[in-house]
Design a protein with these regions (language model features):
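DNA major-groove recognition helix of helix-turn-helix/homeodomain DNA-binding modules
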Residues: 19-36
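Helix-turn-helix/homeodomain-like alpha-helical modules used for DNA recognition
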Residues: 42-102
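Short alpha-helical DNA-recognition segment
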Residues: 1-10
C-alpha cells in the first residue's frame, strides 16, 4: 500500500521520489486537494521564475504578483508551496519602502487591509517558511535569506543574511 512505513520513511529522508499520483492519494486521505495539474504547475513555475528574474534585475513585479496571488489557494496545496510563500514574503517585505497591492491581503482578511495586516501576514508566512527551511533547495534558501534580511532590524544579522543570499544566488 501507499502507507508502507519504509516507503514513507524513504520519501521523508529524500531517498525516494514519490509519484504525483501517490502524493495525491496521500493528501486525499488527509482531506487535502493536492494540486497535480501539470499545465497549471508549469505555467505557475514560469511565472515564479519571471518574478525571481524581475527581482534580481530590479524590474517591475506587480503584474506577475497579481497573476500568482490569484492562484494562491491552489499553489499552497502543490509542489510549489515553498515558492509561492517566498514570492509573497518577498513582495510584501517591500511594503516598508514602496506601495504594494493590498487587495490580496484584503481578500484573505475579508476587510480593508492596513500595515498591521501585512505585517501579520508576513509573520505567519515567515513562520511557516522557518518550518520548511530543511525542505528548501539552495535557490529557495537564498530567497528565504533575502526575506529574513529585509525583516531583521539588527545590522550584523542583516549582513549575515545578505551573505547567505549572495552565496545562494551566485550558484544559480
Amino acid at each position: 500500500g501507499i502507507c508502507v512505513v519504509s516507503y514513507l520513511s524513504k520519501i521523508e529522508r529524500g531517498s525516494a521520489e514519490p509519484d504525483m499520483a501517490i502524493l495525491k492519494q496521500l493528501f486525499a486521505r488527509l482531506g487535502i486537494n493536492y494540486e497535480t495539474d501539470s499545465a497549471f504547475l508549469t505555467e505557475s513555475r514560469k511565472q515564479m521564475d519571471e518574478f525571481f528574474y524581475n527581482l534580481q534585475y530590479g524590474l517591475e513585479n506587480e503584474t506577475v504578483w497579481k497573476k500568482l496571488a490569484g492562484k494562491w489557494d491552489r499553489l499552497l496545496m502543490s509542489p510549489l508551496t515553498i515558492d509561492i510563500r517566498l514570492v509573497s514574503a518577498i513582495y510584501y517585505s517591500e511594503s516598508a519602502w514602496k506601495e504594494v497591492d493590498k487587495s490580496f491581503i484584503e481578500s484573505l482578511m475579508k476587510k480593508e487591509a492596513d500595515g498591521n495586516d501585512i505585517q501579520n501576514f508576513l509573520n505567519e508566512n515567515v513562520s511557516t517558511l522557518v518550518r520548511l527551511e530543511d525542505c528548501m533547495d539552495e535557490k529557495q534558501y537564498a530567497y528565504y535569506s533575502l526575506v529574513c534580511s529585509r525583516l531583521t532590524k539588527d545590522p550584523a544579522e542583516k549582513m549575515e543574511w545578505y551573505q547567505k543570499v549572495q552565496h545562494g544566488l551566485q550558484n544559480t
